[in-house]
From Swiss-Prot:
Residue ranges constituting the EamA domain according to the UniProt record: 30-135, 159-278
InterPro entries: AA-Vitamin_Transporters, EamA_dom
GO BP: any one term: threonine transport
Entry's family note: Belongs to the drug/metabolite transporter (DMT) superfamily. 10 TMS drug/metabolite exporter (DME) (TC 2.A.7.3) family.
GO annotations of cellular component type: plasma membrane
Identification of the protein by name: Threonine/homoserine exporter RhtA
Ranges of the Periplasmic topological domain: 31-38, 93, 140-146, 197-200, 259-262
Protein's job: Involved in the efflux of threonine and homoserine. Can also export other amino acids such as proline, serine, histidine and cysteine.
Cytoplasmic side: 1-9, 60-71, 115-118, 168-175, 222-237, 284-295
Record has Nucleotide-binding as a keyword: no
Length: 295
């Protein structure tokens, strides 16, 4: 990784991660608008195909050399990246965006919990859990939530956890350029699946520009930024900071879909933001991960 990335201030990866999450939320809103045209698998195919082309053109990954011990994590990174996209888009066909994001977040939350070493880290995880608990419709509306969609969102969360863990080891040497190889692996698996299910509509001229925008907002930009953050932040800090995702999804729904938030939901968002801020304020520069400890 270039020396400039290695010497970046401790707060900069946090800002980079927040920008990546905001980009993903914008891309998710746009992607859902394409579902009536090509379906969730088709949007996944567009996102990965076009996003991979952008990443390959920018990073020129054929010049990279990966050590033998990095190849298996790289494979897991690519497969989990594709699985996370595919399962999440399938889930939001039948589950509201905010609920799907909250359920998907169980993956990075588990990473934060199991990577915790200090009592103060556990406090931030508990705050994030409380926020997620009150964001989910656990009262009368839960019976109206599609269980299959919820299961798909949880599956996306599991892929997200693998993405975090494998991404740190796979990207330790080449940083954000690694995402181009990971995206290529994901595309080789999931683009054919999506193309078969979407049919000829996938490549219609009116769909391609929107698909390109989704690819930039949801793949090329955020995953490149996340790879920088992954290799510069402790596992627990990265996982807890991702608690901003459900909050951003809820705010996005309020702005673009006209959804209103109850006082309890506002408190839940406050708890999640507090967890993210607490994790940020207690991050220690010397604790940045150089090699992932999986024990």
């Amino acid at each position: 990784m270039p020396g400039s990335l290695r010497k970046m201030p401790v707060w900069l990866p946090i800002v980079i991660l927040l920008v990546a999450m905001a980009s993903i939320q914008g891309g998710a809103s746009l992607a859902k608008s394409l579902f009536p045209l090509v379906g969730a698998p088709g949007v996944t195919a567009l996102r990965l195909a076009l996003g991979t082309l952008i990443l390959i053109a920018f990073f020129k990954p054929w010049r990279l050399r990966f050590a033998k011990e990095q190849r298996l994590p790289l494979l897991f990174y690519g497969v989990s990246l594709g699985g996370m996209n595919y399962l999440f888009y399938l889930s939001i066909q039948t589950v509201p965006l905010g609920i799907a994001v909250a359920l998907e977040f169980t993956g990075p939350l588990a990473v934060a919990l199991f990577s915790s070493r200090r009592p103060v880290d556990f406090v931030w995880v508990v705050l994030a859990v409380l926020g997620l608990w009150f964001l989910l419709p656990l009262g009368q509306d839960v019976s109206h939530v599609d269980l299959t969609g919820c299961a798909l969102a949880l599956g996306a969360g599991a892929c997200w956890a693998i993405y975090i863990l494998s991404g740190q080891r796979a990207g330790a040497e080449h940083g954000p350029a690694t995402v181009a190889i990971g995206s290529l692996i994901a595309a080789l698996i999931f683009v054919p699946i999506g193309a078969l299910q979407a049919g000829e509509a996938l490549w219609h001229w009116s769909v391609i520009p929107l698909g390109l925008a989704v690819a930039i907002l949801s793949t090329a930009l955020p995953y490149s930024l996340e790879m920088i953050a992954l290799t510069r932040l402790p596992t627990r800090t990265f996982g807890t900071l991702m608690s901003m995702e459900p909050a951003l999804a809820a705010v996005s729904g309020m702005i673009f879909l006209g959804e209103t938030l109850t006082p309890i939901q506002l408190l839940a968002l406050g708890a999640i933001i507090a967890a993210s801020m607490g994790s940020t304020l207690t991050v220690r520069k010397e604790s940045k991960i150089k090699e992932l400890d999986i024990n």
